Amino acid sequence: MDEDLRERIEREAETAALFNALKHESDAQVGAILGPMMGENPDFRPHGDEIPGIISPVIERVNGLSDEEKRERLEELAPEKVEALAAEDEGDDRPLPELPNADAYDDVRMRLAPNPNGPWHVGHARMPAVIGTYKDRYDGWFCVRFDDTDPETKRPDLDAYGEILDAIDYLGFEPDEVVKASDRVETYYEYGRKLIKAGGAYTCSCDAESFSELKNNAEACPHRDKDIETTLSEFEAMIDGEYSAGEMVLRVRTDIEHKNPALRDWVAFRMVDTPHPREEAADYRCWPMLDFQSGIDDHEFGISHIIRGIDLQDSAKRQQFVYEYFDWEYPEVIHWGHVQIDAYDIEMSTSTIKQLIDDGELDDWDDPRAPTVASLKRRGIRGQAIVNAMVELGTSTSNVDLAMSSVYAENREFVDDEADRRFFVRDGVEKPLAGGPESASPPLHPNDEDRGRREIPVGDAVYVEPDDVPADGERVWLKGLGPVRHEDGAFVATDDDIEVVRDGAVDVVHWVPAQESVPLRLRTVDGDEAGHAEPGIETYDADDIVQFERIGFARIDRHDDEESVAYFAHP
């Protein structure tokens, strides 16, 4: 990273920290600063691993200033930010705005409506993060409703139901009710009948191409004026499975001349020949389309507020035709933009990830290379860290960027104090060692002397990382052990004191003893890295978090006969 870019990063961080601290009347936090800063400065993102270390001392310095000093400094750096502070609504500075017309409802009731066609990728975590946060804010209610009424195109995965509920639990939320739409098909049939009797629907046997041509020309199909009795009879025949896929649909009678063709006489029910994978729903052949099913359920469950993607604005408009036939009030709707997530080479797509697993390119949904919620959990990322980062994105209609470094910064706040420090050397180079102490005793945590120290036997050789081997005749400081000089392929202890490190003359590097180290495989987003950890790593239990010094945090996964395995969380 060049010096100009580093100075820009420090300046942006200082400005953001000053604004954040004054706005919230509290210390600025790395996690709250990092996400927006990376979103507003795309050229920072390639350096996401380095930036937390650069901005942490800047934020610490800002937090040490008085409010008056902060305001004066912000006036120097960004006077427009001072003006923005003055214009802030002092009543609410939370990233999520108040829900529209929340006071008009006895209860805030929301729904999370996943399609169970596979476990969740990282982007899916945004909805439960926001809905769960709103539930807590308003002491509200939310259900998980599995929208599983498409047995063919978005075929449900039987394992996904439980995996999605596990993901929600991992994120820290508990739904008040769990519903499968495929258990409610008879309810949708009953509302289909009611809609027909209200004059709001008709059966249509036009092929898709013919109807599309008529619709685009704002012309009614010949079945539109069919009488109610005939429509009811044909709908019952659909329910009884007397038609095959494509032979008959039930359409909502809207406005055939509506300026938006997508709203003209849309399909409410269609025939599907493929059986549903759930045994309880396998006999149904007449299935509701999502817009009909979802609209009915939102009313039946008393949903007050819906959050959905901005690309689904037509869904609300379609459903409002049904609501008008039944004289129902439509819920409040918040449309938000898409979230783009960096740090992954794999497309954020359930079908893509599933295909890579089937092809053997990924081990499973919790492979550290996979952009999935299960992967983040196995890597040791706390669910609350994901929630905090997602909530910071707000609910704007604009597309937003989530820098994974902001998730990592949030997680660092949770794990930094608890994680013991340990050494792990990747692809180690063995160097004989002459002289120096027989053992080293670095602290388990640099900020917690009461936690004690770990004893590392040295032996007569050590492993260091290839990039840490100095040129012949040069010195390094083996962390927790002391200074050595590289002479004729070996390390020889010297009597230098710590001043050579403070003066910048000697680098500090980590190491492990060659004889008593523990083989360890570190699984990362970029692939597996083999190496050796210091003795004692095998005493940690699965799910324990450690920090491999100069590398980052990792979750201990297991200890096999030949090696230990850990999953890399983040720097």
Swiss-Prot record:
Q: Which UniProt keywords apply?
A: Aminoacyl-tRNA synthetase, ATP-binding, Cytoplasm, Ligase, Nucleotide-binding, Protein biosynthesis
Q: What is its main location?
A: cytoplasm
Positions of region (Disordered): 431-453
In the UniProt record, which is one GO cellular component term? cytosol
Give compartment(s): Cytoplasm
Q: Which domain of life is it from?
A: Archaea
The residues forming a coiled coil are none
Q: Which GO terms describe its biological process?
A: amide biosynthetic process; glutamyl-tRNA aminoacylation
For this chain, one GO molecular function annotation is: glutamate-tRNA ligase activity
Motif placement: 'HIGH' region: 114-124
Q: Which reactions are catalysed by this chain?
A: tRNA(Glu) + L-glutamate + ATP = L-glutamyl-tRNA(Glu) + AMP + diphosphate
| Protein EC | 6.1.1.17
Function field:
Catalyzes the attachment of glutamate to tRNA(Glu) in a two-step reaction: glutamate is first activated by ATP to form Glu-AMP and then transferred to the acceptor end of tRNA(Glu).
Family named by the database record = Belongs to the class-I aminoacyl-tRNA synthetase family. Glutamate--tRNA ligase type 2 subfamily.
Protein name (record): Glutamate--tRNA ligase
Species this chain originates from: Natronomonas pharaonis (strain ATCC 35678 / DSM 2160 / CIP 103997 / JCM 8858 / NBRC 14720 / NCIMB 2260 / Gabara)
Q: Which gene codes for it?
A: gltX
